[in-house]
Amino acid sequence: MVRCGCALLRKYGNFIDNLRIFTKGGSGGMGYPRLGGEGGRGGDVWVVAHKNMTLKQLKNKYPQKRFVAGGGANSRVSALQGSKGKDCEVPAPVGISVTDENGQVLGELNKEEDRVLVAKGGLGGKLHTNFLPLKGQKRIVHLDLKVIADVGLVGFPNAGKSSLLSRVSHATPVIADYAFTTLRPELGKIMYNDFKQISVADLPGLIEGAHMNKGMGHKFLKHLERTRQLLFVVDISGFQLSSVTPYRTAFETIILLTKELELYKEELQTKPALLAINKMDLPDAQVKLQELMKQLLSPEDFLHLFETKMIPEKALEFQHIVPISTVTGEGIAELKSCIRKALDEQDGKESDAHRSKQLLNLQSSS
């Protein structure tokens, strides 16, 4: 068990999803008191989104992780107004949340060329500074990557999430018959006949206690924050992490996964959710499916079997429940159709909400 944990840490270390950098705006230029000349303002430091950039590439390219903008030009006889210092741009991947040392969000990079100002340059010397320049702002900045996708796959290890991703998209994640095969987020796209594309993120499997960062839970759970919908993937035969951990039925895994999301961030429970019940090719799968459906239809009749701390405050209501087999392909086409339908419905609701908001703004301004 310890050996597995060490391997997980080593391999996951190759994928960087958080980077701490030092930034400093440029100092202002000297003023020219005799002629009233003003020094140029120091350059600013910006974090800018680049499509093909990764945090690992950023770290390798700038191992010191220091980004300092240029100083403003001094005022002189031939140029009384000093020119502004050169800005410094920090290239970062799309999907970055930029925060300071106190956790305050400075901005987000949701698409290519989005930019966030992280350190301002100092003022140039002028009358109210006695023509003395000011230093630029210093700031420690955290770049936190959160995968952006339409659908995020949620499940315990070895539930078949990677196999499902390879079935519904052209992604080629590592697939094996043991836990923790996926050690970093994998992205794939579902392609439809009308050229519609839906992005799907396969996240490393969660374990009980993920909300407390067990099994790197925080590294994994945070990637669900920017997905529009959740797709739970559950093994119909249940789950057991190891011989020393309790066996969980399919129903128990759903309850526990819901609780983990709730304890990490309650907002995750407000996301629309679907359920894929995997491994329907196994013996007795149909019998277990009938039992699971009965439990899902009336969960309150079975929650007394759980410890109080394991019961979520609010049970998730799945928009669609689809039995599948990633081995035989059973239910895959239906699942893709349900994913499309659920997202189309969500698009419609978001459009209606946007139109209502615009109408209210027009009414209040008239």
Curated annotation (Swiss-Prot):
The main location class comes to nucleus
Q: Which segments constitute the OBG-type G domain? A: 149-344
Q: Superkingdom of this entry's organism?
A: Eukaryota
Molecular function via GO:
GTP binding; GTPase activity; magnesium ion binding
| Location of the region described as Disordered in the Swiss-Prot/TrEMBL record | 346-366
Q: Which residues form the Obg domain?
A: 13-148
Chain intervals with Basic and acidic residues compositional bias: 346-355
Role, per record: May be involved in the ribosome maturation process.
**One GO term of the cellular component aspect?**
mitochondrion
Keywords for the protein's UniProt record, in alphabetical order = GTP-binding, Nucleotide-binding, Nucleus, Ribosome biogenesis
Q: Which residues bind GTP?
A: 155-162, 202-206, 278-281
The Swiss-Prot or TrEMBL record describes its family as follows: Belongs to the TRAFAC class OBG-HflX-like GTPase superfamily. OBG GTPase family.
The record's listing under PROSITE patterns reads:
G_OBG (PS51710), OBG (PS51883)
Where can this protein be found? Nucleus, Nucleolus
State the organism of origin: Mus musculus (Mouse)
- The name on file for this protein is GTP-binding protein 10
GO BP annotations, alphabetical order: ribosome biogenesis
